[in-house]
Design a protein with these regions (language model features):
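C-terminal substrate-binding subdomain of Rossmann-fold SDR/epimerase-dehydratase oxidoreductases
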Residues: 199-200, 204-305
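Active-site segment of SDR-like NAD(P)-dependent oxidoreductases
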Residues: 87-89, 128-136, 174-177
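NAD(P)H-binding glycine-rich loop region in Rossmannoid oxidoreductase-like domains
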Residues: 61-103
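Short-chain dehydrogenase/reductase
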Residues: 20, 101-102, 142-154, 182, ...
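SDR active-site strand-loop-helix element
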Residues: 20, 49, 84, 123-129, ...
Length: 305
């Protein structure tokens, strides 16, 4: 099945696609994927919900984003709910844990209400690779509230979906790229780009550490295509496996700079990867041709322009 046909079936098999957190990195990436169809078809099928009412100009088209109180009333029975609304991890540095949890509880309330009240076809939960820290009872529990909350929401969404006959697509995200990147301070990739642009040098503290990178639009498309099947699926994000040294080298190449600008450290950090082969296989089955790391970096550099 071609990607164009697959995208069509994703929309045709669902009454509606709801993107919650539409103005964020993953929300815009999901809209990018769906908008690859004729704009008129996309506008008929998509409901965008954000923290407030506004308009989003994406790829030359204006899209209305509804506030939560208005948006939830427009969710149709049989919709796919793409849940991309969540406070970023680095906000824990600016808020107390209590404030962070309270604000996230306010945000996820709409998602939980949608599952309970709207008879959704499927619900897509964007979790995080850090949730695995809580997978085994014998492990020492970290104090990071972000990790703890991601794991607890996996459990809650699973229970809600099971009780309301809604298929759950749960994806633990490890490392992303893409032109809608909006987190510039705490990601290795964005840090490398900043260093290369400002210092003409990239400091790679853990050159041998491995990560898997996937383009956010490729990830969103794979998730939406799977969600259209109406089946429970849980997996880690995947993409291309690279070391931090290889990533830095590709960033320099993308900026037209020489690899002599690398400053390599000797810190041994654990790899940050999940069962990426499963995701890559699922993406292939869905007809999604994942971008290689060079193309991913080229797309990501657009976020800095």
């Amino acid at each position: 099945m071609t990607l164009e046909k697959l995208q069509g079936s994703t929309l045709d098999q669902s009454e509606q696609v709801v993107i919650y957190g539409a103005n964020g990195w993953m929300g815009r990436s999901a809209l990018d994927f769906i908008s690859a169809l004729k704009p008129t078809i996309a506008k008929e099928k998509i409901l965008l919900i954000g923290s407030k009412s506004c308009f989003l100009n994406l790829n030359g088209s204006n899209h209305e984003i509804f506030a939560p109180s208005t948006g939830i009333t427009s969710i149709r029975e049989g919709a796919i709910f793409f849940n991309a609304a969540f406070l970023r991890r680095e906000l824990l540095q600016k808020m107390t844990p209590e404030e962070y949890l309270h604000k996230n509880n306010e945000i996820v309330a709409l998602a939980k209400s949608a599952i309970k009240e709207k008879k959704l076809l499927s619900f897509i939960n964007l979790s995080s690779g850090v949730a695995r820290d809580f997978d085994h009872e014998f492990q020492i529990k970290p104090t990071d509230e972000y990790s703890r909350l991601k794991k607890s929401l996996e459990i809650e969404y699973s229970e809600y979906c099971s009780q309301n006959q809604t298929a759950l697509v749960n994806c633990r995200i490890f490392s992303l790229t893409g032109r809608h990147l909006n987190e510039f301070d705490n990601l290795a990739l964005s840090s490398f780009v900043y260093q290369a642009k400002s210092k003409n040098q990239i400091d790679v503290k853990s050159p041998s550490t491995k990560r898997t990178y996937v383009d956010a639009t490729d990830l969103a498309g794979t998730l939406l295509s799977i969600a259209a099947l109406g089946k429970d699926v849980s997996f880690d994000s995947g993409g291309e496996l690279v070391t931090m040294r290889q990533l830095a080298e590709r960033v320099l190449a993308g900026l037209g700079k020489d690899v002599s600008a690398l400053a390599l450290g000797d810190i041994e950090s654990p790899d940050y990867i999940g069962e990426f082969e499963k995701f890559n296989s699922l993406a292939s089955e869905m007809g999604q041709n994942l971008l290689g790391i060079e193309d991913q970096i080229t797309n990501t550099l657009n976020a800095f322009n």
